[in-house]
Amino acid sequence: IGVRLVGSEMCIRDRSIHYRLVPTAFNTFVGIGPYEKGLFHILDIKGTAVDTIGEQPYRDEAERNVPELARAMAYQGKIIISPKGNSLVHAIFMSPIISFYKLSLANIELLKSHVDCYPTYKPELGNNSYASAMSRSNILGFIDVAVTDRYVYALLSGKSTRESGLSAFTGNVIRVYDWNGDLLKIYTCNTDLTALCVSADDSIMYAIGLVEDYELLVANLK
C-alpha cells in the first residue's frame, strides 16, 4: 500500500485507516486519512464514525474527477488542534497548502485556505493497492506545525527534491498565522529545521536544526 503513515492509527470500529486523529473540545475526534470519500472523519468518544466532512483538495474540475482516495495520497499532511480544542489547522506536506477551520459539535467550517501551488502526480489505484506517484519537481509544503492559543507556526519547505535533494525535507521559513488563517509574519532562519515547538506564551521557539549535526536550537521571540 502506497501510504506514508506518520502517527497513524487504525480505528477498529469504523474500519478506516487514519493518518492522524485529534481530540476536540466536543468529546469527538477528527481524523484525516486515505478515505474513499471525504477530507475529515468525525468520530465519537467510542471511536465510531459519525460523519464525513469536505472533500480532498483539487486544482480544477479535471482533478476533481480523480478518485478521492488517490487525491488523499497526493495531499498528505497533518492536522493540529488548538489548545482549546475548537479550531483546526490542516497543513499539507506534499504541497504548500494550509487551511484553517472552526469546529463545532457537528461541523467543521473552513475559514481560510492559502494555496501556493498544487502538486503534479499520477494516481495508481489497483484492486489491493493505492498510491499516487509524485513528481520530483513538486514544491514540498509544510514540514511541521506548532500551535499556541494565539498563533499557528508553520515550518515551510518550499523546495523540490529534484533541485534540493534531501534538503527539501527541511525548511528555514516559518509562517505565523492567527487561528482565523490570517498571515501575520514570516521568520527566516539561518539554519535548516526539521521540527519546532513554541512556548505557551509565544516567547520562546524550540527547533531541531542542522548545524554541524542535528541540534536543539532555541530562539527568543519577544
Regions from the language model: what does each represent?
Residues 135-176:
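Loop/turn-rich, solvent-exposed surfaces of beta-rich toroidal or solenoidal domains
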Residues 4, 40-46, 167-181, 220:
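Beta-propeller blade signature
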Residues 203-222:
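Blade-level signature of beta-propeller repeat domains, shared across WD40, Kelch, NHL, RCC1
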Residues 19-25, 69-84, 137-148, 197-200:
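Structural signature of eukaryotic scaffold interfaces centered on beta-propeller domains
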